Amino acid sequence: AHPMAGCEKLGIQNSNEKIFYEANYIVVPTDKNTEEGKDVCRQIGEILGFARISELSPYAHDEMIGFVSQLTHGIAMSLMTCNHMERVEDYTGDSFRDLTRIARIDETLWSELFLLNKDALLHQLKLFTMEISKLERMLMEADKEGIKDMMRRSTARRKLFDKEKVEE
């Protein structure tokens, strides 16, 4: 089992006691695990305050992590290294900073994670490349309706992730 929460900053000085609050926690049992062991994993997630505790098979876990974590880190890294315009940091807004926050990455840990899950990550990279190629084609063909449709679909999907604000 493991959390789906972290921080791009290294070191104990960057620890955060609320890092797991409203985060997701994934239990990945194998045929070697007992029901009691799985229950203990779930209880740990509850004690730490995770908002959602899910269970995935090892295969489904690897595919999901390849998509929601490793692909996103790869996209952020690629975005930061694909262009060498000078002083770009002087011209960015929140969207660029939000999208690239995770490009500040622990290369020792993440290179290992990428290679340990390379088949799933390669699969997700292929799917992403196909989708970004569709956008490129629509731009080349000035397909405004196609672009708008892609934007509508992405907006609808993104709404599924929005968490309701907790009133303080």
Feature names for model-found ranges:
Residues 1-13:
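Rossmann-like NAD(P)(H) cofactor-binding subdomain of soluble oxidoreductases
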Residues 7, 33-34, 121:
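Alpha-helix N-cap/loop-to-helix initiation residues
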Residues 13-19, 112:
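Short, flexible, solvent-exposed loop/turn segments with mixed acidic/basic and small polar residues
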Residues 17-102:
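Internal alpha-helical scaffold of NAD(P)-dependent oxidoreductase catalytic cores
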Residues 61-66, 153-159:
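A short beta-alpha structural unit
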Residues 87-157:
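Interdomain hinge/lid region at the active-site interface
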Residues 162-168:
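Long, positively charged, glycine-interspersed low-complexity recognition regions
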